[in-house]
Design a protein with these regions (language model features):
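Short, surface-exposed polybasic-aromatic patches that bind anionic ligands, especially phosphate groups
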Residues: 23-365
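C-terminal motif of bacterial Sec signal peptides marking the signal peptidase cleavage site
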Residues: 14-15
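Sec-dependent signal peptide cleavage junction
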Residues: 18-19
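Short, linear, compositionally biased motifs with a strong N-terminal bias
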Residues: 10-11
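Sec-dependent signal peptide recognition
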Residues: 2-7
Length: 365
């Protein structure tokens, strides 16, 4: 029945919103390209989109950062117990210790180590999305750690299950309640030969300067279901530019349709590819960076880390401390020009109207 309702909703949505023509022979692997055609993660921006300049303030603390989603799409792997740990984001406590009951068991290779020695930063967001043995159910939890091979993993919060064939909106990005797999840059994307990125992205920005809060909106908008717990005392407290009420947690941020991307004079090829994705699909605001930087969400899985592949392909990391590099300057070119799609709603995903590019192809049988 649930699958029928998803299909019915998709037909109704497409009847009300035009779409560009797709390649009728193309298919996709749900493990690499999940969720329905009309999921927020797959829906292109429409010609009916209404753009409001976000006026994101230029970052000062670093040139660019990433936020890694832990993605495990290995449903045939042996089951690993994931037990309770209550360290959370307290830097004085360890996420490695088992401190309570087993939350659930999931197919994750024991050889995959996610620990203070391997992760970035002191207390990363650490959202895990793992495909269960039924090859359909995605479980999500946060903050995940697996510090020792042969031992249980740990985490604290468990989110509602998602269907890999469904809309996949929600999950383990705690600042917004949005997915820890949808929107992530996946291994095999953004290479010299992979072609355009064909899904929405996810970004984090600095809440104190860029995420609006008031008592009415509580600092978030659809599809986010919340903002950070500290939002009322934190968001917009260091804002210098004009107020942009539309730029709240969950906002769909995009380069406007009228913008000629070549006019931005990108210095690096991967930035130009990213810019096209920001224009055709946009990026959902899913977390606060909590320091004065931009972040794009990327995959870390047992198969590898996106940034390692990026370095092999392009000769430099997505992460840079310096603002005075070609990549950092390109990130300013993108983020400082982002606009909120202000009419992005459940019935007009991407703003509605004919889509800028074709919808995702059907799933491979």
């Amino acid at each position: 029945m649930k699958r029928f309702l998803i299909i019915f909703s998709m037909v109704l949505f497409l009847a009300c919103n035009g779409q560009s023509e797709a390649n009728p022979e193309e298919t996709r692997d749900p493990l690499k390209w999940p969720f329905s055609q009309t999921s927020i993660w797959n829906m292109p921006i429409g010609l009916g989109a209404k753009y409001v300049h976000a006026h994101i303030e230029k970052t000062m603390a670093a040139g660019m950062t990433i936020d890694e989603d832990y993605i495990v799409m290995m449903p045939d792997a042996p089951l690993m117990d994931i037990a309770q740990n209550f360290a959370g984001w307290n830097r004085n406590k360890s996420r490695c210790a088992v401190e309570g009951k087993v939350l659930f068991s999931a197919p994750i290779p024991q050889s995959w180590i996610v620990s203070p020695e391997t992760w970035d930063g002191a207390t990363p967001n650490a959202g895990l999305a793992v495909l269960m043995p039924d090859r359909k159910t995605i479980k999500q939890t946060q903050p995940f750690a697996h510090c020792t091979a042969g031992q249980p993993a740990t985490s604290q919060y468990v989110f509602e299950n998602e269907d890999i064939y469904g809309d996949g909106m929600y999950g383990a990005h705690g600042g917004s309640g949005l997915s820890a797999i949808g929107g992530a840059l996946r291994l095999g994307e953004l290479t010299p030969t992979s072609g355009p990125i064909r899904h929405a992205l996810k970004v984090n920005i600095y809440g104190k300067k860029n995420i609006y809060y008031d008592a009415e909106t509580k600092g978030f908008r659809w599809p986010a279901i919340r903002a950070d717990g500290y939002a009322s005392a934190n968001y917009y407290t260091e804002r210098k530019l004009e107020t942009v009420k539309a730029c709240r947690m969950g906002a769909l941020l995009a380069l406007p349709a009228r913008m000629n991307l070549d006019s931005l004079d990108f210095e690096t090829k991967p930035a130009r590819i990213l810019a096209e994705a920001f224009q055709n699909f946009g990026a959902y605001l899913v977390d606060d960076t909590a320091w004065d930087v931009y972040a794009i969400v990327t995959e870390w899985s047992p198969d590898g880390r996106f940034d390692d592949a990026f370095k092999r392909n392009w000769g430099f990391s997505m992460k840079t401390n310096s603002k005075n590099t070609a990549w950092a300057r390109d990130m300013d070119r993108i983020f400082l020009n982002l606009h909120v799609i202000d009419n992005n709603t459940a019935t007009t995903i991407g703003g509605g109207g004919k889509t800028r590019v074709p919808l995702a192809p059907p799933f491979r049988e």
